[in-house]
């Protein structure tokens, strides 16, 4: 069996962390840029959230689809509402 093919998906990240697959996109936190980014199957990058708080350590979703973010500096668990409020 041949080895799996390795490909670079994205460059230019400060520090990518907490990858999650959600709604057919790869989501992750870029700690250094203080962003939450989504990458689709065609390689299109979207900055979904630019955080006003500290480092977006980890992300996940509630069953109803609301985004959860752990903010490292403040030691907070934040929930993003449908109207983009935290």
Tell me what each language-model feature is.
Residues 1-12, 41-43:
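A short helix->beta-strand "capping" segment at the edge of beta-propeller domains
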Residues 31, 72-73:
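Short loop/turn segments immediately following the C-termini of beta-strands
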Residues 40-44, 80-84:
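Short loop/turn segments that connect beta-strands within beta-propeller blades
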Residues 1-4, 24, 33, 39:
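Blade/loop signatures of beta-propeller domains
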Residues 18, 29-31, 47:
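Short linear S-[DN]-x-LW-Φ motif typified by the pepsin-like aspartic protease active-site region
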Residues 9-25, 51-71:
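Beta-rich, blade/repeat-based domains predominating
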Residues 34-37, 75-78:
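Structural signal for beta-propeller blades
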Residues 26, 36, 45-46, 67, ...:
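Hydrophobic residues embedded in beta-strands of well-ordered beta-sheets
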